[in-house]
Amino acid sequence: VFKDNTITPTFKAGNVSPNEQPADRKGLWLHAFRLMCQASRMAATYEANRSICKYVHSTSRGHEAIQIAAGMQLQPWDCATPYYRDDSMMLAMGFTPLELMLQLLAKTDDPFSGGRSYYCHPGSRALDRPLIPHQSSATGMQVIPATGMAQGIRYLEKHLSDSLAIGPEGELPVVLCSLGDGSVTEGEVSEAWQSAILWELPVIFLVQDNEWGISASSDETRVMDAYEYAAGFKGLKRMRVDGSDFEDSYAGMEAAVSYVRKERKPVLVHATVPLLGHHTSGVRKEWYRSEEDLSIHLEKDPFPKLKARLLKSGVTEKELLDIEKEAQDYIEAEFDKARISQDPDPRTVKDHVFAPAAVTTEKGNRSPENGAKVMMVDAALHAVEEILQQYPEAIFFGQDVGRRLGGVFREAATLAEKFGDHRVYNTAIQEAYIIGSTAGLSAVGVKPIVEIQFADYIYPGFNQLVTEISKSCYLSYGKFPVQTLIRVPIGAYGGGGPYHSGSIESTLLTIKGIKVVYPSNAADMKGLMKAAFLDPNPVIMLEHKGLYWSKVPGTQSAITIEPDADYQVPLGKGRVVLQAHPKDTQKGKTCCIITYGMGVYWATAAAAAYPGQVEIIDLRTLFPLDEELVYQTVSRHGKCLILTEEQLNNSFAQALAGRIQLHCFRSLDAPIFTLGALDLPAVPINMALENEMLPNPQKVKAMIKDLLAY
C-alpha cells in the first residue's frame, strides 16, 4: 500500500488483526522460530568457545527477526549482498550452520572463501540459493556492487532476456542489499541510491538500525536516521518496520520485495533492531555500553516476542522447548564437525589471485597490407566499437562518454549513436560508482567498460577498487573474478595543469589483484584493449593523453597502421622498440632503456645520438610484468636505464630497479639508473615549468652518456 513516497506493509492474507491466525502463518512462524533458535544457539556456542572461535566475528543477536524475514523472501534467481552481521539471513536463504561455521573457523571446506575471509562474508554461486558476490568488511561499500547487480539485471532484462535467470513462472530477479545504520553516512551509499533511482533499478536497501556504530551512538554520529535521510532522495520508496517483531518484519519485507519484483524500482526498508551481542568478538559490549542501554535493548529481544506469538497461536510450551533442544543438539553437532575439519593447505595461499587469462598469445594481423594509419585515440575508439558489435553483453559508461560529446577526448565519439543510450551512456560525477558497480555487473554476466575522465580523479574510486574489485577473485576462492575494463586517460600533454596531468601508475600497482596496461602506440592500444576486455579479471588501461593525437612533438610514430579487428596483444608481454647492434653489445658498448608510455618517445629521440648502442623495451603491461624480457635484456647489455614520467621517488621505476639488481646482479656493469619527473606535488600549468619538471630527450641523452661511460 503506497501513500506518497512511503509503503505501508500488508500481508498476502489481507489486513488481519494479530489475533486472527491464517493456517499458513503458524507454519511460517514455526520455521522462523527454528531458524531463530539456531542463530541464537550459534552465537552462544561461539561465545562459549572463544578460544576456538579465535577469528574476529559478529553475530545477528537482536537482528534475527528482520534478517530471517528478509532471507525468506529471496529465491534462487535473486541476488543478495549481506553484511557481516547477517548470519540469520544466511540461514533463512538456505545456507547451513555448518557452512557458516566452516568460514568462522577458517577451514579449507569453507564454501565461501576457502578459509580466507571472515565469518559471514559469503560469496556463493549455489544454484539453489540467491547469488551472493564476494562481500567485504568495509562498511557500506557493498551498496555500490549491489546496485551494479541491479543495473546488470535491468540491462539483461530489457535487452538480453535469454541471459537472465528468472523464476519458473517468469518471476524477475531482485537484489537485496543489507547494511547497518552506521554505514549510511558513507558517501558511496548516496552514489548508489542516486543511480538506483535514476535508472529505476530493482534493488531493496535494507538498513538494520541498532543505533550503534561500534562504540559511537546514533546521537553522536547522525542528525537523522536512514528513513528520514531517504526522504531527500526523490523517487525512493521507503518504509519503517519493527525489526525485532517477526510479523511486522515479514509483512514489510514481503511488501518491499513484491513491489520491486513487479515495479522494477528501488525501495528502502528501515528496520529498528536491538543490539544484543557484541559489535564483534574483539570489541565487546561491556566495554562501552551502560547497563541501562543494554537492558533497554534486551526488552526488544525478538526471540521472546516470537515465542509469545507462537504460544498465543496454540503452540505448546513443550513444543517450543523441543525445538530449542533440537536446535541446541544440532548446532553442537555441527560445531564439532566444523572444529575437526581440515585447515587450508598453506601451499594453496597463492591460488585464485586471478582467473586464467583468455588471451595468452598475440593473435591477428598487426599491420594488414594496404591498411590505413590511425591515431591512438581512434584505435581505442575502433576497438571499443568492435567489442560492442561482437559482444552484446558489453556496455560502456562514464562521465561524458555518452551522446552529444562522446568523451572529452572524443575517445567515445558516435558510439552512443551507433549502439544506443542503453549501452553507451553518461554517468554522474561519481568515480566510486563507476568503478564499484562493475563488480556487480560482472557478477550477473554483463561485461562493463568504464572510464574515469582523468587519472587525477580516480582516487574517490579507490575504496571500491581495493575493497571490492581487487580482492573479489581471491577471497571468493575464484568464484567471482571481476571482469571489467577501466579506461583512464593519463599523463601530461602540455599545459594541462596540476589536476589534469598526473601519473598514477605507482599508486595503482600497490593494489594486488588488478592488472595495469599502458600502450604507447595505436596498434598496441587496439590489441591490448581487446585482450583487456576479454580478460576475466579487472584491467586498468592507462591511455596517455599526449599520445592520443600525436600532437606532442616527437610522437608521430604513435600513429600506426590499424590492426585487423581480431588483433590481440596478450597482457604481460613487452616489445622491443629499438635493438642495439649485436657487435656493439658483444663489445660491452651498449645499454638498454626500460620504459613505457611517453617514455618510449623520449628514449627513441635520445637514442638517435648513440646509433646501435641503445636497446629500448616498451613494457606495454606494467602488471603482470614481462620479467623474462626485462631480465634477459638487462643481462645481455649489463647497463640499464629505467625511464618513467612519474615523480621518481618511491615509484614503480625505482621498485623495478631494485628487482632488476636482485635478479641480474652478476651481469651488471653499472648500477641501474632511473629517470623520472622531479619530486613535486603536482605538474604546474605553466608549460615552461612543466617542461622543467618532466623528463625529455635531452635529459635522457645525458643519462645515456653517463651510463655508457660508467
Language-model regions, residue ranges each:
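Short beta-strand segments
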Residues: P82-Y84, G140, A146, S178-L179, ...
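Thiamine diphosphate
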Residues: E64-A65, P130-I340, G402-V482, ...
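Cofactor-binding active-site loop characterized by glycine-rich and histidine/acidic residues
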Residues: R41-W199, S217-G235, P498-H500
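Conserved acidic/glycine
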Residues: V1-Q67, M72-Q73, A271-F419, I429, ...
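Internal gly/pro-rich beta-alpha loop/helix module
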Residues: I490, G494-V539
